[in-house]
Amino acid sequence: MVANNAGQPATPADLINVDEVIGKYYDLVPDPEVPEQRVIFGTSGHRGSSLKTSFNEAHIIAISQAIAEYRKKAGVTGPLYLGSDTHALSGPAKKTAIEVLVANGVHGRVDSRDDFVPTPVVSQAILTHNRAADGTQRFEGEGLADGIVVTPSHNPPTDGGFKYDPVTGGPAPAETTNAIAARANQLLGDFKSIKRVPYEEAIKSEYVEGFDFREHYVDDLENVIDFDVIRNSGVRLGIDPLGGASVNYWPLINEKYGLNIGVVRPEVDPTWRFMTIDHDGKIRMDPSSPYAMKGLVDELNAGAWDKYDLVGGTDPDADRHGIVCPNWGVMNPNHYIAVCVEYLFGGNRPGWPEGAAVGKTLVSSSLIDRVAASINAKVIEVPVGFKWFVDPLFSGEVAFGGEESSGMSFLRKDGRVWTTDKDGLIPDLLAAEITAKTGKNPAQLHQEQVERFGESWYKRVDTPTTLEQKAKFAKLTGDDVAATQLAGEDITAKLTEAPGNHAKIGGLKVTTKDNWFAARPSGTENIYKVYAESFVSPEALDKVLDEATVVVDKALSE
């Protein structure tokens, strides 16, 4: 259900009190006996709010100590790259982490400009550090680096987040995050094992080193994007960083590569007062949401399109992207993925490994499969979460990984790994490359794909639930679906494992020739999500969703 104020400008009542949010970070102490106050890692680390005693100083002390102990046991002896975004809680949490990491003798690399550092920039720094002399990636041996990014991604301004990237540069696997969370929760109940020094001492110690993340990342971008094509075409690219960590990267990209990039809204404000309200009535900095991006779209339609041929967006930690085209608005991430797949695998990356696959999550559109099949590209379908692309991108088995929630990354032009975490900057730049090379923007190319492969209707519905009900999703099987048809079509598969890697999906996916739905719990919120798509009609999509809800509710009630 869409909130009445969705798409409307934020009002004073919608804004956080920054001093209160930061004050509660230090003042409130979590009780490890209360489930909601424990350390819980979702697909992207620990997230919560200081106001709800779910993201406080004690959490970060415990998690940082647990990470220091984990990397020691794992034999990680190189530097730890530390990034953070523009959320109000990110600065305090970053300082807390430095206090604990230094006390544990961890060599940390922080931004030499004291700037925000996006998620993909940390991933790229880890991977380039861990590259062997012959250009291959190392994941074993002395001197390997890892990292931490302090971010709740596009979550509301009240929230904080803290995630660990191991030596492979991307989201940590479940066995790693589970071990860190278990140790952190032990420490929450007993701080005796924690080492910590005051920040003023820690930041000046031999264990903290400045590193120019921005220049390191921007200098390397030419190995991923064809800047010559963009520059020679004169394509005018607008960028809205949504008040996030990429804000100071775009001017350097523009200057270094001689492009025509303009930053539409360069302000950084931890209240995000310049945003329009998202679908659920909250301020959420999601560059793929038509509601959150309505303020930008209105500004463009009021005359700013005179300056730009297309506009890209990034979220607070710049791991998600959004593409806005004239006479179209915000593109559906599924549609943009399909356009990228056809462009990249259709002859524009000749240096990629032969046979490297398209990686997609199982809740992404089947349009991607149809496009890939038309150019003989293999598709590997994995569970939700970018962590499932880490190893395939690392090895080159997958050349492109994309998910419906506007996260993607892809290989360098020479076929080596770029990042193993989502990168919101390169999709925006790729949109400019695609426009320059084809003479058509991504929305126009999507319309051509619809003519060839058919139109589809896609929707996600979120439903409140409990921790107990969320746990039941892991027990769902194909037998829980008694029906033989879905929206009038014969069911062709009832999946509890992803076909691409046979990993458990933590829920259920049911498919027919032209319809499908998938149901799974959120990793960070007490909701479950039902995704559905139909290539038949909007009415068929509604029927798919109705029948999916019956299946899920019946399974959860047993």
Descriptions of predicted regions:
Residues 2-103, 128, 199, 203, ...:
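An N-terminal, well-structured beta->alpha segment
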Residues 33-43, 195-198, 263-270, 523-524:
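Flexible hinge/switch segments at interdomain interfaces of large molecular machines
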Residues 83, 147-153, 313-316, 401, ...:
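Short beta-strand segments
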Residues 57, 116, 121, 516-518:
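Metallocofactor- and cofactor-centric catalytic cores in central/energy metabolism, strongly enriched
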Residues 440-558:
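Catalytic-core signal marking the mid-to-C-terminal active-site face
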Residues 2-13, 75-170, 369:
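Ferredoxin-reductase
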Residues 12-15, 20-27, 101, 108-123, ...:
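Phosphate-binding chemistry for phosphorylated carbohydrates and sugar-nucleotides
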